[in-house]
Amino acid sequence: MLNYALLMVLHLIGDFYLQSDKVARCKNARVGEKCNSCTECKKGSYLNVKYVLIHSLIYVIPFLLLVLITDVKTLALVILILAVSHAIVDAIACWANKKTKVTVVFLIDQAIHSVVLYLIFRYAGLNGIPDAYAAAVKVAFVVLLLMAPCSILVNKLMEDTFPESVSLGLFDVGSIIGILERVLVVVFAYLGELAAIAIIITVKTWARTADLQDKEFRNRYLLGTLASLVSAVLVFMLYKLI
């Protein structure tokens, strides 16, 4: 499973950390104040093909590292499969975002990408990763997953539940607090200090006592906190499976 974890690490880098806000917005044809209003993004458009293709090409860049554990011919085939499948899945996701809940689309989108990577793991004949790198791959997988992907998932859940809410960027204060919260939850879960997790939630809640008097804020706070906690627990469970 270590090779699969490596594929997931490369996927996370390509899909979340090499994708700029502009590409993410433009591939979904979201015309706004920060948009130059490309001719492809007319009113009612579902996607911008140019940016879907740009993202798909950038996405496969991290996978070039697989040359260390496979031959060039196999690598070329893997890169081609990943680029084409990613473009197709993302194009469908862009269309679906206009039709249904973005949280559902996001989860299905990532599930499909994960299945494609698993098939590559099973049938591409990749060489094994030396045990010396096992810990680094596992830690990278957990850290990368706890940051951007979990933050985006929470943001999309908030967007679906509270349509008027403003999405937070990865490095906004709220997102940073959420990231630190998830990291601490995973660390304490790894150490078996479950009581410390309760303390984190207690301190966080105490710090927002005044704001919690507002019903709307209270609902947002509870949903965001619970979603963040659940995602952290799921990441820890995935770590244990690697």
Walk through the language-model features, giving the residues of each.
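Transmembrane helix-loop-helix
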Residues: 63-85
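Short, aromatic-rich membrane-interface segments at the entry and exit
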Residues: 72-79, 131, 195-199
